Amino acid sequence: MESYARGQTTIMYEREGDGPPILLLAPGGMRSANNFWNNMPWNPREKLQDQFELIGMDQRNAGISTAPITKNDNWDVYKEDQISLLDHLEVEKCHLVGMCIGGPFIANLLKTYPERFKSAVMLQPVGIDQNRQAFYDMFDDWAKEKINEQSGPTTETMTKFKHNMWDGDFLLTATEQEISRIRTPLLILMGNDLYHPQSTSRKIADLAPNATLLEKWKSSDFLEGANTAVIDFLNQHT
């Protein structure tokens, strides 16, 4: 992997393939790292690199990326890492492909920097629907590791950070009204479990004016069709 430093933050990233650029925003919750794609039923690192240049990153304090943790950290510090990496690589405009926590990452980028993105694919985006405690528990599990590191953050800092990240509603980084104003073409591959509620995917598809919902994709019977749908969608908007 290559590294990009911005202040005290070091982001590790990989570039694979050749073609129009795509920023990959990996699953894994607070542990979102590029190698998490390798365990997913649909892996863009396998399926897309013949036609696209893939920019895959480890988010701050995930994988081998590092950054200070403060009580003011929130979704926006991740957003600025992501857009700064694109600036560093001189990528003026690209596609987005994100799974799980990648859904809120994508929404935050699209509502703030719509001119930078041609299209976006959200795979089973996380969202809030009577499941907030599950996200608190997921965060706390990750936070224990960070607190135990040498010179790690305090419990108080991590508690504030947790609430900054997971106290929102719906898609966490965007309200229903904000999603309704996103004009960027969206393809949503529906979630259907505790962390990735079906209701979140459906609501995004209902609200965003240029969104398409693909309901069935994860099982072996549907994966090839889903792969074709993603590639066709990206090519259509390249």
Question: Model-found features: residue ranges?
Answer:
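Conserved alpha/beta-hydrolase "nucleophile elbow" surrounding the catalytic nucleophile
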Residues: 94, 98-100
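Flexible "cap/lid" loop of the alpha/beta hydrolase fold
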Residues: 104-112, 117-145
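Catalytic active-site module of serine/aspartate enzymes centered on a nucleophile-bearing elbow/loop
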Residues: 211-238
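Conserved HGGG/HGGXW glycine-rich cap/lid loop of the alpha/beta-hydrolase fold
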Residues: 7-66
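Conserved alpha/beta-hydrolase "acid-adjacent" motif
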Residues: 194-200
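Hydrophobic, aromatic-rich cap/lid helix
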Residues: 150-175, 192-193
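Conserved acidic catalytic loop of the alpha/beta-hydrolase fold
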Residues: 77-94
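Short beta-strand/loop motif that positions the catalytic acidic residue
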Residues: 182, 188-190
